[in-house]
């Protein structure tokens, strides 16, 4: 009974967060644990779309999927030799936020954001996540950050 109670409480918290979300992002493992499903399209249609139009799923070396009301697109991960994946998700999220700011995407722009702009934003997330996976640190270095920002 205690497990069911905990699962119910977690489910209620997830729904509350979905109601406030403008972008939902998680890994395939996250959604397997939450919903018992790893198919991103199925998770989007059955659990996310009603609450939020923009859904990003990360799949490690198998890339990133973006689902919106208007389109679905897959982005391949860069080929790297990972040392550790600790921090990859947090750095991906940081890269997404950086990309939104870099490309001057505002809240009002999200519903009509085109595939090319999404691609640039997601590339920022993948760049930061890929960088952190190539070290034993769970964050990007100051040197990488400075170089990355100067390339913009």
What is each residue range found by the language model?
Residues 1-45:
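Conserved beta-alpha-beta core of the PfkB/ribokinase-like small-molecule kinase fold
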Residues 37-152:
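Conserved phosphate-binding/catalytic region of the ribokinase-like
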